[in-house]
Amino acid sequence: MTTVQEAVPNLIPTQDATPRPAPKKVEAGVKLRGADKVARIPVKIIPTDELPKKPDWIRVRIPVSPEVDRIKQLLRKHKLHSVCEEASCPNLGECFSGGTATFMIMGDICTRRCPFCDVGHGRPKPLDVDEPKNLAVAIADLRLKYVVITSVDRDDLRDGGAQHFADCIREIRALSPGVQLETLVPDYRGRMDVALEITAQEPPDVFNHNLETVPRLYKAARPGSDYDWSLDLLQKFKQMVPHVPTKSGLMLGLGETDEEVIEVMHRMREHDIDMLTLGQYLQPSRSHLPVQRFVHPDTFAWFAEEGYKMGFKNVASGPLVRSSYHADQQAHEAKIKL
């Protein structure tokens, strides 16, 4: 079990007070990634010499399938983005080969610059007013039964993008009335009340927002975000729409301790969160936050056991688990009637 004393020193190499070049000017529509992206956060990330070698339980075989190409072509046809591609998800091959995808709306440029994430940062373009209809058509073409919709952060919008989520849900249900929808939303920083009022009018079947990491690591891992704000967002939605299950997740391997993970899980239950995902953080590039540890599958299994003891309806906990990975199975196993 990892202690705080063991975890804290490991974070020191990621911070440096030495001068650094001025970050590149951000132009509208230009996507910054890697070193250009993390250069704009308060805590300097020192590039690692090389990416860490993954243990055997982390390695993924990339299946070769025409279905992968078909879905990619369909996304391009409808001018859509998948978080599977943008965030370099290790499960992309499996999900695409199975004919499913998690759709990322509101563009592929995020106004945040979290150094664990591989999605590009910058000044996004205006919303595509045709995206809700295009998304609905694509989902109908794929004949999907369970769909996850997520987004980049859009701090440039007065409602944080909540109305665009609602428009997408409305269009999808019009063309595919039997589809079940899970939304993985941003934190709506400074816009919680207006965003939740809109969301409550057109709620999804599962409302998901990730805490991502333990509060001690927020400054380094989630600059611009607030741990308690995210918990409140999930609880307030549950109070407004009590019949819709809520869900959240954590990445492990950023320097947290097992005790801190358990404490966050308790806080989640105190805020009426129903479903939990726990997965291993994988460093997207040398310029991102380094992996501090690879959590053993047995430890993930232990977290799942503890989660069920706390009252979570479902816990998906494993090295390759991601928030939207097998989300349909998770909802089904939780026996949630959608």
Curated annotation (Swiss-Prot):
Keyword Transferase: yes
Enzyme class: transferase
Occurrences of domain Radical SAM core (ranges): 96-313
The enzyme's E.C. designation: 2.8.1.8
One family name in Pfam for this protein: Radical_SAM
Molecular-function GO terms, alphabetical: 4 iron, 4 sulfur cluster binding; lipoate synthase activity; metal ion binding
Disordered: annotated segments: 1-24
Keyword RNA-binding: no
Cofactor binding note of this UniProt entry: Binds 2 [4Fe-4S] clusters per subunit. One cluster is coordinated with 3 cysteines and an exchangeable S-adenosyl-L-methionine.
Chemical reaction(s) catalysed: [[Fe-S] cluster scaffold protein carrying a second [4Fe-4S](2+) cluster] + N(6)-octanoyl-L-lysyl-[protein] + 2 oxidized [2Fe-2S]-[ferredoxin] + 2 S-adenosyl-L-methionine + 4 H(+) = [[Fe-S] cluster scaffold protein] + N(6)-[(R)-dihydrolipoyl]-L-lysyl-[protein] + 4 Fe(3+) + 2 hydrogen sulfide + 2 5'-deoxyadenosine + 2 L-methionine + 2 reduced [2Fe-2S]-[ferredoxin]
Binding positions for [4Fe-4S] cluster 2 per the UniProt entry: C110, C114, C117
Binding-site positions, [4Fe-4S] cluster 1: C84, C89, C95, S324
Pathway(s) this gene product operates in, as recorded in its UniProt entry: Protein modification; protein lipoylation via endogenous pathway; protein N(6)-(lipoyl)lysine from octanoyl-[acyl-carrier-protein]: step 2/2
Subcellular location: Cytoplasm
UniProt keywords, alphabetically: 4Fe-4S, Cytoplasm, Iron, Iron-sulfur, Metal-binding, S-adenosyl-L-methionine, Transferase
Cofactor: [4Fe-4S] cluster
Cited InterPro entries: Aldolase_TIM, Elp3/MiaA/NifB-like_rSAM, LIAS_N, Lipoyl_synth, rSAM
Top-level taxon: Bacteria
One CC-aspect GO term: cytoplasm
PANTHER family (UniProt xref): LIPOYL SYNTHASE, LIPOYL SYNTHASE, MITOCHONDRIAL
Stated family: Belongs to the radical SAM superfamily. Lipoyl synthase family.
UniProt name for this protein: Lipoyl synthase
Organism the protein comes from: Pseudomonas putida (strain W619)
Encoding gene per record: lipA
